[in-house]
Amino acid sequence: MKEVIFTENAPKPIGPYSQAIKAGNFLFIAGQIPIDPKTGEIVKGDIKDQTRQVLENIKAILEAAGYSLNDVIKVTVYLKDMNDFAKMNEVYAEYFGESKPARVAVEVSRLPKDVLIEIEAIAYKE
């Protein structure tokens, strides 16, 4: 059985997709970009500012589904510029302290709305 997850505390999808889908004990979170859900605007600033907003959006979706950051098991990070990797990691480490999920980070030529970062995540909860 699958369940669509939606919360006003994260940005509305910018296309024909769900914020997240819960399937069994898994939660699949769609790629999140640094949109402030209160304003609907892209967060201005550097990679740290944008990474923080993306992770706050993911956290809000997790909480809406009854999960937490500790339940995240896999993350995919899309960066516009791999030179931002170290700065992104500084912020990322604030959110994933002891419970570090498996992760991949790749550089891409372009992201929606020309943002610097997009992150998708998979969570699992017994």
Curated annotation (Swiss-Prot):
GO terms for cellular component: cytosol. InterPro entries: RidA (IPR006056), RidA_CS (IPR019897), RutC-like_sf (IPR035959), YjgF/YER057c/UK114 (IPR006175). GO terms for molecular function: deaminase activity. SUPFAM superfamilies: YjgF-like. Belongs to the RutC family. This is RutC family protein PH0854. It comes from Pyrococcus horikoshii (strain ATCC 700860 / DSM 12428 / JCM 9974 / NBRC 100139 / OT-3).
